[in-house]
């Protein structure tokens, strides 16, 4: 496990120009606007960068299928069979998560996936879990089942006429889950909140620069 944090150290001095601060509810959050990764050769710097880029591209594509066109510098983001550790003897889940601030919201999004073994291109990939929290309140959690939190927290971002159709939306969302598709970018976007999905997508496109 590796955590790349942009939270400034409590006693860090001299970086005020690069620290953003936002108050959400009664909590003040601080974050660095950028960071530099340095270290000796073969220390894992490229792995960190490519892991963040791979997470970003998978989320924006919305599924675990390979990209149709292969033209990016980071091959693993387009051919997911390159992601698993080549030293593994049995498949192990791959986990991605991110926490960020946008439009006055603290967003926590994560998913884990079974991608098979290294170079196993024909493996039946599947999403194992997926979770979205806004301001530390559960919006949805997907494991063996799909569970929703209190959607009143995002009332202003819900699709039109959601209240009139929410019973059917919940039922359809649970029955229509696709093992290879991220719920955030598919069912949640179409049946619950295209606005929230768009905010997350735009942040990944415009703010997560790797």
Specify the residue positions occupied by each region the protein language model found.
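Pre-Walker A-like glycine/lysine-rich segment at the N-terminus of P-loop NTPase domains
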Residues: 1-54
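Charged, glycine/proline-rich intrinsically disordered loops and linkers
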Residues: 8, 13-25, 73-76, 153-166
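Short, flexible loop/turn elements at secondary-structure junctions
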Residues: 8, 41, 100-104, 113-115
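Post-Walker A helix-loop "phosphate-sensing" segment adjacent to the P-loop in P-loop NTPases
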Residues: 55-67
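Short secondary-structure capping/junction motifs at helix and strand boundaries
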Residues: 64-68, 106-109
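AAA+/P-loop NTPase substrate/partner-engagement loops
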Residues: 68-89
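Conserved amphipathic alpha-helical "coupling/scaffold" segments
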Residues: 87-110, 127
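Electropositive, glycine-dotted interaction segments
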Residues: 107-210
């Amino acid at each position: 496990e590796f955590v790349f944090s942009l939270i400034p150290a409590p006693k860090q001095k001299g970086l005020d120009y690069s620290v953003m601060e936002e108050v959400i509810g009664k909590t003040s959050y601080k974050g660095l606007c950028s960071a530099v990764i340095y270290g000796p050769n073969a220390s894992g710097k490229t792995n960190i960068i490519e892991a963040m880029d791979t997470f970003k591209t998978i989320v924006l594509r919305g599924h675990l299928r390979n990209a149709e066109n292969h033209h990016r510098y980071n091959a693993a983001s387009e051919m997911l069979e390159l992601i698993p550790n080549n030293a593994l003897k049995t498949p192990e889940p791959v986990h991605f998560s991110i926490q960020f601030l946008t439009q006055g919201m603290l967003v926590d999004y994560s998913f884990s996936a079974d991608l098979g073994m290294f170079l196993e291109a024909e493996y039946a990939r599947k999403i194992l879990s997926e979770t979205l929290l806004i301001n530390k309140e559960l919006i949805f959690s997907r494991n063996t089942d799909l569970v929703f939190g209190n959607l009143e927290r995002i009332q202003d971002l819900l699709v039109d006429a959601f209240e009139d159709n929410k019973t059917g939306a919940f039922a359809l969302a649970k029955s229509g889950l696709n093992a290879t598709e991220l719920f955030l970018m598919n069912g949640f976007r179409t049946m619950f909140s295209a606005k929230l999905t768009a905010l997350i997508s735009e942040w990944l496109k415009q703010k997560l620069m790797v």
